[in-house]
Amino acid sequence: SAINGWGSWWLSSEGVWLYGGWHNVMNGIAGLLNIFCMTGWWAVYASKDGKDMIWPDMIWVYIIVYDIWNFAYTYNCLPTHSWFCGVALLLAPTIAALLWNKGGWIMNRANTLCMWCMFAQVFPLFQETFADGSTKYAWATITTQYADGTMNGIAVGNAVNADPTAMTVVSALALITNAIALIYIVRKSIKTKTNPYKGEIFTDFKYYKDAAARAVIK
């Protein structure tokens, strides 16, 4: 959408009007940084009960910056669905991982994402917002990207009814937080003389210790 609709509206293959700009670029860079915030690749284990995949070094530092980045992505690229595939779908695995399923975030994320995608394709009107701003269900919402709450006057190549302010703010937040997290990881890896990808960085954190206690580590 950044290329096809830079500073103007563009109709995606899903029939959603997108408004491209620097917010897409910032979020794209944040996504690349987020990849490098994943540490401890060689330390992923099965849980002792055999029900979970445990990644002890994927602690709240990564989980939070991932959530911020992914919400910005959905807000930019799936604006009429961002409450569901953004906020709600991100909170589900995060709450579980922070409270009772420590170390199991990535498996929770995969499972909830799969369930949501299957549900949304079977019941698409659950999340649909129509061009006039109306919805089948009251909880479906249209974002402030559409300035007057509708898609009135929108056409390919124009900027009528566009307000990218919120998209710019969340994308900038995603970029800043992921940059801070990566800088912290690099500094910690230098200090501990540890390869952050073959080794583990957050072994001194309580979250790591709680997660590792659930895993079969040989």
Which residues does each PLM region occupy?
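Generic multipass alpha-helical transmembrane bundles of integral membrane proteins
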Residues: S1-G103
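C-terminal transmembrane-bundle signature of multipass membrane proteins
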Residues: C85-K218
